[in-house]
C-alpha cells in the first residue's frame, strides 16, 4: 500500500460515518442468522397498554416491603407501636385508594385546562378543593 499525504482539516464534530459491511464478512451460506426482530410500538401505545393492565388488576401497586418500611420508619419515634401484617395491608389499600382518586381528579383538572400533561399545580388544586376542610381543621 502506498502512503498518501493528508492535509489538516477542521473537525466538525458529530458522529463518525458508518463503515459499510464488506462482502467478505457476510457468510456465504445464504441464510441470515435468526435474530428476532423487535417490534416498534407507536408513541404512547405502551403507556396505554400499561394503564389498561393496571386498571384490570386488583393487586397492590406499591410493593409491600418498601411500604412497610416507610410506615415503620414514620412511627419510629413512638414507643411501643406495633403493627399486624393485616393492618399494614389494609393501610396500604387505603393509601393506594386515596392516591388513585387524587390522580383521577387531578387528571380531570388537566382535561379541563385543555392540556395533556399532569402538572404539580393540578394536584395542588385538587388537594385544596377536596381536602381544604381537613387541612384547616387540623390547624385549629
UniProtKB/Swiss-Prot annotation:
<dbReference type="GO" id="GO:0005634">
    <property type="term" value="C:nucleus"/>
</dbReference>
<keyword id="KW-0007">Acetylation</keyword>
<feature type="modified residue" description="N6,N6-dimethyllysine; alternate">
    <location>
        <position position="15"/>
    </location>
</feature>
<feature type="modified residue" description="N6-acetyllysine; alternate">
    <location>
        <position position="24"/>
    </location>
</feature>
<dbReference type="GO" id="GO:0000786">
    <property type="term" value="C:nucleosome"/>
</dbReference>
<feature type="modified residue" description="N6-methyllysine; alternate">
    <location>
        <position position="24"/>
    </location>
</feature>
<feature type="modified residue" description="N6-methyllysine; alternate">
    <location>
        <position position="19"/>
    </location>
</feature>
<dbReference type="InterPro" id="IPR007125">
    <property type="entry name" value="Histone_H2A/H2B/H3"/>
</dbReference>
<dbReference type="Pfam" id="PF00125">
    <property type="entry name" value="Histone"/>
</dbReference>
<feature type="modified residue" description="N6,N6-dimethyllysine; alternate">
    <location>
        <position position="5"/>
    </location>
</feature>
<keyword id="KW-0544">Nucleosome core</keyword>
<protein>
    <recommendedName>
        <fullName>Histone H3-like protein</fullName>
    </recommendedName>
</protein>
<dbReference type="InterPro" id="IPR000164">
    <property type="entry name" value="Histone_H3/CENP-A"/>
</dbReference>
<feature type="modified residue" description="N6-acetyllysine">
    <location>
        <position position="64"/>
    </location>
</feature>
<comment type="similarity">
    <text>Belongs to the histone H3 family.</text>
</comment>
<feature type="modified residue" description="N6-acetyllysine; alternate">
    <location>
        <position position="10"/>
    </location>
</feature>
<feature type="modified residue" description="N6-acetyllysine; alternate">
    <location>
        <position position="19"/>
    </location>
</feature>
<keyword id="KW-0488">Methylation</keyword>
<dbReference type="GO" id="GO:0030527">
    <property type="term" value="F:structural constituent of chromatin"/>
</dbReference>
<feature type="modified residue" description="N6-methyllysine; alternate">
    <location>
        <position position="10"/>
    </location>
</feature>
<dbReference type="InterPro" id="IPR009072">
    <property type="entry name" value="Histone-fold"/>
</dbReference>
<feature type="modified residue" description="N6-acetyllysine; alternate">
    <location>
        <position position="15"/>
    </location>
</feature>
<feature type="region of interest" description="Disordered">
    <location>
        <begin position="1"/>
        <end position="36"/>
    </location>
</feature>
<keyword id="KW-0238">DNA-binding</keyword>
<comment type="subunit">
    <text>The nucleosome is a histone octamer containing two molecules each of H2A, H2B, H3 and H4 assembled in one H3-H4 heterotetramer and two H2A-H2B heterodimers. The octamer wraps approximately 147 bp of DNA.</text>
</comment>
<feature type="modified residue" description="N6-acetyllysine">
    <location>
        <position position="56"/>
    </location>
</feature>
<dbReference type="GO" id="GO:0003677">
    <property type="term" value="F:DNA binding"/>
</dbReference>
<dbReference type="GO" id="GO:0046982">
    <property type="term" value="F:protein heterodimerization activity"/>
</dbReference>
<comment type="function">
    <text>Core component of nucleosome. Nucleosomes wrap and compact DNA into chromatin, limiting DNA accessibility to the cellular machineries which require DNA as a template. Histones thereby play a central role in transcription regulation, DNA repair, DNA replication and chromosomal stability. DNA accessibility is regulated via a complex set of post-translational modifications of histones, also called histone code, and nucleosome remodeling.</text>
</comment>
<feature type="modified residue" description="N6-methyllysine; alternate">
    <location>
        <position position="5"/>
    </location>
</feature>
<keyword id="KW-0158">Chromosome</keyword>
<feature type="modified residue" description="N6,N6,N6-trimethyllysine; alternate">
    <location>
        <position position="5"/>
    </location>
</feature>
<keyword id="KW-0539">Nucleus</keyword>
Amino acid at each position: 500500500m502506498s502512503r498518501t499525504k493528508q492535509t489538516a482539516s477542521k473537525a466538525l464534530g458529530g458522529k463518525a460515518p458508518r463503515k459499510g459491511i464488506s462482502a467478505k464478512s457476510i457468510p456465504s451460506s445464504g441464510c441470515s442468522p435468526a435474530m428476532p426482530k423487535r417490534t416498534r410500538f407507536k408513541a404512547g401505545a405502551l403507556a396505554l397498554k400499561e394503564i389498561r393492565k393496571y386498571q384490570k388488576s386488583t393487586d397492590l401497586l406499591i410493593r409491600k416491603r418498601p411500604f412497610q418500611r416507610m410506615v415503620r420508619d414514620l412511627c419510629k419515634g413512638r414507643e411501643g407501636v406495633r403493627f399486624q401484617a393485616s393492618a399494614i395491608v389494609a393501610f396500604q389499600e387505603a393509601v393506594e385508594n386515596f392516591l388513585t382518586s387524587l390522580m383521577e381528579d387531578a387528571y380531570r383538572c388537566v382535561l379541563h385546562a385543555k392540556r395533556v400533561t399532569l402538572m404539580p399545580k393540578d394536584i395542588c388544586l385538587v388537594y385544596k378543593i377536596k381536602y381544604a376542610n381537613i387541612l384547616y381543621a387540623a390547624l385549629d
